[in-house]
């Protein structure tokens, strides 16, 4: 799948931090902004390809929404709404594609055509 999308203009593949180990359950890439990520997701859905977590799951997979953690809220002056603007921008401009063990042979080409 990486080869199918690596040369698409406007897509930057995510680089995993040094020393980390990926779980190999998703391919994550970045696009210029939130609007592009949402357009990408819509195009993928037209190809019957769902995304995994990004861009849609920032409401529960992002520390900005973790108001149930009083220590985190207190550490950021009582509100998390504007505590992580760079993280929000990066997450909103990310798309995550699921990786399956028995992926259909045409899956990468369908991703690329979206």
Task: Report the location of each language-model feature.
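Short, proline-centered helix/strand-breaking motifs
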Residues: 97-99
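Conserved glycine-rich beta-strand-loop-beta hairpin in the small C-terminal domain of fold type I
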Residues: 2, 13-30
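Short, solvent-exposed loop/turn segments at secondary-structure junctions
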Residues: 18-20, 34, 57-60, 101-103
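Short, conserved charged micro-motifs
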Residues: 34-41, 103-110
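Alpha-helical elements of Rossmann-like donor-binding domains used by nucleotide-donor carbohydrate transfer enzymes
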Residues: 26, 110-114
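Short amphipathic beta-strand starts and helix->beta connectors
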Residues: 7-14, 78-83
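Conserved PLP cofactor-binding pocket of PLP-dependent enzymes
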Residues: 41-95
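Conserved core segment of the aminotransferase class I/II
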Residues: 1-10, 38
């Amino acid at each position: 799948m990486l080869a199918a999308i690596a040369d698409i203009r406007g897509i930057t593949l995510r680089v995993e931090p040094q020393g980390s180990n990926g779980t190999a359950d998703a391919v994550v890439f970045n696009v210029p902004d939130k609007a592009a990520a949402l357009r990408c997701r819509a195009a993928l859905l037209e190809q019957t390809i769902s995304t995994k977590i990004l861009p849609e799951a920032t409401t529960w997979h992002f520390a900005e929404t973790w108001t149930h953690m009083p220590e985190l809220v207190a550490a950021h002056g009582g509100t998390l709404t504007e505590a992580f603007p760079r993280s929000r921008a990066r997450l909103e401009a990310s798309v995550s594609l699921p990786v399956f063990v028995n992926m259909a042979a045409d899956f990468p080409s369908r991703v690329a055509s979206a």
